[in-house]
Every structure is written in structure tokens, then in C-alpha cells.
């Protein structure tokens, strides 16, 4: 019997059942289709272990035109619309970067990394959303910005499936131009720089326009990132271009004041690139024209020189140095989580920077020479060497203690002190929750030297529930609980701007009591993290350097 000829009440029931079946099919479909403002995309259904329901993934969605040809060293432009349904079931190519397989650190860490294609056409994002989510679900959104010193990394590095399924939130992972292509600046109108940051802004604008189609709430967006990704998040907090694009910020082991990732001036990078390029250009306009004509291989050869590359004060994305913007209160007053790991320079960072073999040879005799060289790299005047030795090394002669204190000094200078400074600036206008991640993952103990505690990046496993590139390891029961707690803290923050919730150890806001959370298998509240070191780096050292310089100039006059 045709549907239209059924009795009225039965017709209503039949239509209701059809709609229900259609809705269920839409939830659990192996090939979900969603709209975007430039066309439709087809994703995949993924079952997530230990969760009631699976998720839908949409991989490699373009949020900007390919930044090639005349768009190399230019702001991103809106993507072109497409007809039909675009396939979004495979990971996008990474942005051009040094082949991570060849890095000493990866070999030494015994990590298995699957080769991923690279392309200059790389401005894509991935979306992970609960399978039941639909337009109107209004789920909180978290946008992940990967780390890698602004020279390495990809959206595929961190699999957000577990976090999205466990906490029922929409997660977006974005890519941005890296290295020379992402951050080269001529210091003038020919190439202002910060292209990678402008890509991130374009991705955040795309989220505002489109995330509702995937079940997300564009009025509840939290940006989060680790290392250089944390630096990126922190830079959006101070950038006028990012206003209204997010409502909460999480900075994991990276803020806008990280010394190697922000620069007032572009001269050093400019000269290096100009020399390596062989362009022999008389001015910046000619240099950019020449660089736009370089092949992928030629750009990669230049890139290899940079272990990290700084963003610049370009007058647009960053109108002033982040320190000035923070000090003057010129930033977006959004709630923040800011944190560091116990041993930021315990192993991974020194290996990556090529410092590990130097640190291993430190003795009382060699220490001054090593410190002199390191101080120059850290842009610190030679006058500070004795002060740093006194503060960190004291009178000890033991080489192992000296090496450990040197690593602590590096970690404080590069990560801890900048994070504390940013937290103190931001708490004047919005809640800040500070943490120190202290747990050494059990599965990695055998690979690392015994002195290393929670190293740079160890927290990320407990945020996503998997290690880099989706690698999973057996966790202890205590670690499983820590993982669930960290995920819940992060998701609660995305939902309400406050990480606290039922069945979670209390996390106090960072106020004048200087309380913070020690994130460990047994979380505890700490007070005044590294207060003496903060005083040393921000007050004592600058003051003594000024005094020394003053006495030297008087001596020169005499």
C-alpha cells in the first residue's frame, strides 16, 4: 500500500519512523556528508576504544587557497568553492619542512614515524566530532595548533579521536605554513612575515563560518596548543586580528614570550635567507621575486638551517612585541590554562637543538666556556655568566649536578619563566589556571636517560590519549586515571571556562596566593612555583646587568 493511502494516524507514525531511521543512519553512517560554505565534504566513521559511541572524522578540508606562486609570502586567501562532494577521508599533506625521519632526536628517541607526503599546498584542517553531533548540537569546540618550533609538524601528528569521543566535544586540528615559507619577513611592505600566523587566523575564521555544520558552537571556541603551538595560542591572545575568533586559550609549554620564537627585528633571518638563496637581489622586492621562483627543493635546503624560526613584530598580526602588549593590558581577556612540564629541557629539546653532547661533557672547568657560548645564543650579555653560575650551580664540583642544573637553567629560561610572566600579566583581566605536569610516562622510561622526569611534550599524551602520530602504549591504572582527569579538566574548561568539575581534585585559580595544580598521578595544589627563579630572571639579573654596564661605561670614561 502506498504511504499516502495509509490511515492518517498510521501515516504520521510511518513518517516518524522514516525520519528516525534517517537520523540514525546520519549518526552512524560510514560516510557522513556535511556542508561547508564552499561545498560538501564526505568523512568517515571511526570507532573509538572504550567509548560508547564513535566519531566522524573529516580530514583535509581546505580553509584557504593553496599558498603557491604569487601567494607564496602573501596572506592566505579564501578557498575556491567546489561542486559535488569532496573526499575528506585521508590526511592532508604536511607543509614543507625538514624531513623529520632524518632528525637525530627522532632516531635517538627510537620513535617510529610513518612517512607523510609534503606539499606547499597544505592549508587544510581536520575535524573530529561525535557521531551523534548534527547542526544545532552546539557542542563546545577546541582548535588544536601543533608545535614544532614553527618549522616542523602537521595536523596528523595528534589524533583527537579519543578526546572528541570521550568528552563529546568537536575538535579541529589545523595546519599552517612553516619555516621560511611561514615566517620569512623582509621587515617592510614587500613581505611583512608571520604568514603561518595569518594562516591560523584564516583557519579560525573558517571555524566561525562552518563549525555549526559539524555540531559545534562557534560562540564557544577554545584554542589550545603545545610548544610552538602554545606560543601560537598566546600570540592570538595579544593579536588584534584574532579578536572574537575564540573564547578560551590553553598554552602547554609555550607562550608568546618564548625567546627563540619571537623577534623585534627580521635582519638575522633576512640575511641568512638572502645568503643561502643565491639570489643576489639588490633590495627586498627583488629578493621576494627571486624566492617565489625557487623550487621546493631549494626552499627545503634553506629551511634546514633553522632549528626554529621566530615570528616577528609585523605591525599587523603583532602591532608591538607581545611583552609590551601584555604589560599594557592590550590583549583579549579570555580565561586561560597555562602550564609547563617539570623537566622541559630534560632530554628532547637539548637533543633536538644539538646541545645534548655538549651538556654531557660539562665539568666545573668547562662550564664557563659552555655558558659563554650558550649566553650568546640566548642573546644574553656576557656579564650575566657569573650571575647564572652563582644562581644555578653554586660551589658544586659534581659534573652530574652541574649538568642537571644547566638543564634546569635552560628550561627556566626557555619555558618556565616566560609562562609564569604571561600568566601574571593575563590574570589581571581574566581567570588563569596554572599547572606543572610532573608525571614521567612509564612506557618511555627505558628509552630516556634516568635523570629525566616529565620532559617537554609528555603532557600531550594525556590530553589526547595517544602519543605522536596515533601511537598507543599500555598505560598503568594510575596513568589511565591521570589521562581521564586531564581530558576532563581540558574539556570542562572548553565547556565553561573553568577546568573544575565533579570527581576532580580542585584546581585553584592563579591569584595572589600563587596557587597552581601539580598534575601527577596524585594531583596536589602547589604554591609560588619557582618564585625565586622568577625573581632572578625578571628582577635580579636585569638589574645587575644594568649596574655592571653602568660601572663599565664609567670606567671607560676614566
From Swiss-Prot:
Pfam family, one: COesterase
Catalytic site positions: 227, 344, 456
Tissue occurrence: Expressed in liver, stomach, small intestine and kidney.
Gene Ontology cellular-component terms listed: endoplasmic reticulum; intracellular membrane-bounded organelle
Major localisation: other
Swiss-Prot/TrEMBL keywords: Disulfide bond, Endoplasmic reticulum, Hydrolase, Microsome, Signal
Chemical reaction(s) catalysed: all-trans-retinyl hexadecanoate + H2O = all-trans-retinol + hexadecanoate + H(+); (-)-trans-permethrin + H2O = (3-phenoxyphenyl)methanol + (1S,3R)-3-(2,2-dichlorovinyl)-2,2-dimethylcyclopropanecarboxylate + H(+)
Modified residues (N6-succinyllysine): 296
Signal peptide: 1-26
Domain of life: Eukaryota
Intracellular or extracellular location(s): Microsome
Disulfide bonding pattern of the chain: 95-122, 279-290
EC number: 3.1.1.88, 3.1.1.-
A single GO molecular function term of this UniProt record: carboxylesterase activity
Protein family according to the UniProt entry: Belongs to the type-B carboxylesterase/lipase family.
PANTHER family: CARBOXYLESTERASE
Function: Carboxylesterases that catalyzes the hydrolysis of pyrethroids pesticides. Hydrolyzes permethrin faster than cypermethrin. Hydrolyzes retinyl esters.
Entry protein name: Pyrethroid hydrolase Ces2a
Gene: Ces2a
